[in-house]
């Protein structure tokens, strides 16, 4: 068994120390605060302007890479101290995003056939997809390792430009501790975790939302009427408006429920023998909480296959949460980036629906909104006509 790295696929001391360090220092650098909100809003506005220029050239089909880059900027400015332009983009970053998007689409959270029949990587590495997946993961690892190397070359103790600098400082402080879990390999793994988990799920949330607004124009009308009344078409949105937008909140929650972007959590490992609800779970068993089964439970939701935001609206027209909605998991292993994901989803969707009307091309029947299976569920791709409001 190899060294446990990062926070997504580790447990025990490694997971506890790496997660605690990450949360504490990301908050110091602006994570979850007003600074982060301002960065997200700037990225959302830039993305809106980009879409406005893009839609002049015709229908928009796949916004995946551009949405991912726009969502990446807020997080990446804290992680490595720089941002990227949507128009030109950084070729290496764009290539890494494309590589990771393909890896996510071509695998699933259990590891697919390789997880159930691991010997296939030796007897049929090409047929099983092991060669292709391994190549993409290696390219992604090299991208982040190179970023750490560039930071080391210009790093000065005591000067904290970003998260990478803070982590390098921690490595230096613990270099004489043989039990330390802080090293460059761990840093690269953390960066990959932040990049993969935060970017893919959030960009998919935005794309699913725009997709549902496109195929459900009556719901789009209601959301835009609420936005016009509460914020206006030309005023800057902010998180302070969130509690005054019950219908939009209901729509965003319903998107997360029905799209099941993370159909399960990431794999967990049982660290001790235990019994749960009569089931015996042995030490080292892999446990996958099935979030989709909760979100699509017919007894609880009644009509889980229907996109119906009103299930989150009470008789007084107010938004009500439902404890059965757990897209970020629950407990101590809950998603590290939940706050960032929710804030980004909200501000991006508000900016887009303030400025644009989304509809299907004339004569096109509404497509299925069933997601594409992979490590996460990806929004379906279809032509969308985007017009300024």
Regions found by a protein language model. Give the residues of each.
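Conserved, non-catalytic sequence blocks in retroelement Pol enzymes and Pol-derived host proteins
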Residues: 9-13, 28-36, 61, 87, ...
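Cytochrome P450 heme-thiolate monooxygenase catalytic core
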Residues: 13-14, 33-206, 222
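Conserved cytochrome P450 K-helix E-x-x-R motif and the immediately C-terminal K′/meander segment
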Residues: 142, 236-278, 298
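C-terminal helix/juxtamembrane-tail motif
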Residues: 165-169, 286, 357, 374-389
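Cytochrome P450 heme-thiolate "Cys pocket" and heme-binding signature region
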Residues: 192, 277, 315-345, 370-372
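Short, small-residue alpha-helix embedded
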Residues: 202-213, 348
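Cytochrome P450 heme-binding "Cys pocket" and the immediately downstream C-terminal segment
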Residues: 217-219, 287, 339-377
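Conserved cytochrome P450 K-helix/beta-meander segment immediately N-terminal to the heme-binding cysteine loop
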Residues: 289-317
């Amino acid at each position: 068994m190899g060294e446990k790295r990062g926070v997504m696929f580790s447990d025990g001391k490694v997971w506890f120390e790496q997660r605690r360090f990450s949360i504490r220092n990301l908050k110091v650098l602006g994570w979850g605060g007003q600074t982060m909100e301002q960065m997200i809003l700037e990225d959302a506005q830039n993305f809106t302007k980009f879409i406005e220029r893009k839609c002049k050239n015709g229908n928009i089909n796949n916004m995946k890479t551009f949405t991912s880059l726009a969502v990446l900027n807020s997080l990446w400015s804290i992680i490595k101290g720089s941002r990227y332009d949507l128009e030109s983009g950084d070729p290496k970053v764009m290539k890494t995003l494309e590589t990771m998007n393909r890896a996510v689409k071509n695998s699933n959270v259990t590891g697919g056939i390789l997880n159930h029949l691991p010997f296939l990587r030796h007897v049929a590495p090409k047929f099983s997809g092991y060669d292709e997946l391994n190549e993409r993961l290696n390219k992604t690892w090299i991208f982040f390792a190179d970023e750490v190397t560039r930071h080391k070359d210009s790093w000065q103790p005591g000067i904290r430009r970003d998260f990478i600098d803070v982590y390098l400082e921690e490595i230096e402080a613990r270099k004489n501790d043989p039990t330390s879990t802080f090293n460059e390999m761990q840093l690269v793994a953390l960066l990959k975790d932040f990049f993969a988990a935060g970017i893919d799920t959030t960009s998919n949330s935005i794309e699913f939302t725009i997709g549902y607004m496109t195929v459900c124009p009556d719901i789009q009308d209601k959301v835009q009427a609420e936005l016009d009344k509460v914020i206006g078409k030309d005023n800057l949105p902010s998180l302070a408006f969130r509690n005054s937008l019950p219908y939009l909140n209901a729509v965003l929650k319903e998107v997360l429920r029905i799209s099941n972007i993370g159909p399960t959590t990431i794999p967990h490992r049982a660290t001790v023998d235990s019994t749960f609800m009569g089931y015996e779970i042995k030490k080292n068993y892999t446990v996958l909480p099935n979030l989709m089964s909760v979100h699509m439970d017919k007894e609880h939701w009644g009509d889980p296959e229907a996109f119906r935001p009103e299930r989150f609206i009470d008789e007084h027209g107010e938004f009500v949460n439902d404890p059965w909605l757990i897209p970020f998991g629950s407990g101590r292993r809950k998603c590290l980036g939940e706050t960032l994901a929710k804030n980004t989803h909200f501000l991006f969707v508000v900016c887009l629906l303030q400025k644009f009307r989304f509809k299907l091309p004339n004569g096109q029947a509404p497509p299925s909104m069933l997601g594409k299976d992979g490590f996460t569920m990806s929004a379906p791709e279809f032509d969308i006509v985007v017009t300024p409001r």
